[in-house]
């Protein structure tokens, strides 16, 4: 596992030394597995840092990241703590998890559920109870940031794999 840290300046800009993500003594085993895929893992990502999670096939990268989202966490035996901005994910409800932790699947076909790019971008906001005006504003801001303004009314089936991952 490798961590690239932008240093004290980026942490100071966030206003806190509290890690964005903190993993404490995490172990996880899938049901019926002979061995744990994660065992005694300690890892943290400071706020404002850019982190890379690198490892071989089957080393637990996807498992670890899935465990950070209670609503998609795999079944199995887990020990240890996972904290996001100091809050244990075991104590988060679905709304808090959705507001604090995003997850992009490796295969974008598993995450696209709407027919147009605009509706896909608004989907999460709608599920969080955002007003129509807020959805319009935030989709406009995000599409501008990623240069997707011309794509908003396109069918999601016409997007390349890379565009779907955005």
Language-model features, listed with the residues they occupy:
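A short, flexible loop at the N-terminus of ABC-type nucleotide-binding domains that lies
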Residues: 11, 15-23, 27-40, 72-75, ...
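The feature captures the beta-strand-to-loop junction immediately N-terminal to the Walker
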Residues: 54-57
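Helix-to-loop junction immediately C-terminal to a conserved catalytic motif
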Residues: 69
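Conserved ABC transporter NBD signature motif
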Residues: 77-88, 97
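ABC ATPase NBD coupling module
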Residues: 88-102, 127
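Short helical segment in ABC ATPase nucleotide-binding domains corresponding to the A-loop/adjacent helical element
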Residues: 109, 115-126, 136, 140
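Conserved ABC ATPase "signature" region
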Residues: 133-151
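Conserved ABC ATPase signature
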Residues: 155-159, 163
């Amino acid at each position: 596992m490798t961590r690239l840290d932008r240093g004290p300046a980026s942490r100071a800009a966030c206003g806190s030394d509290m890690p964005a993500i903190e993993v404490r003594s995490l172990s996880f085993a899938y049901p019926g597995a002979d061995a744990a895929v994660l065992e005694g893992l300690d890892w943290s990502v400071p706020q404002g840092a850019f982190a890379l999670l690198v490892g071989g096939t089957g080393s637990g990268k996807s498992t670890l990241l899935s465990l950070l989202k209670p609503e998609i966490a795999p079944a199995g035996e887990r020990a240890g703590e996972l904290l996001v901005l100091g809050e244990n994910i075991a104590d988060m409800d679905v709304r808090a998890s959705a507001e604090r932790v995003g997850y992009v699947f490796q295969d974008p076909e598993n995450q696209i559920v709407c027919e147009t790019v605009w509706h896909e971008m608004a989907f999460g906001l709608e599920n969080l109870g955002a007003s129509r005006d807020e959805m319009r504003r935030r989709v406009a801001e995000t599409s501008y940031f990623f240069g997707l303004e011309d794509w908003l009314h396109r069918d999601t089936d016409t997007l390349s794999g890379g565009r779907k991952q955005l």
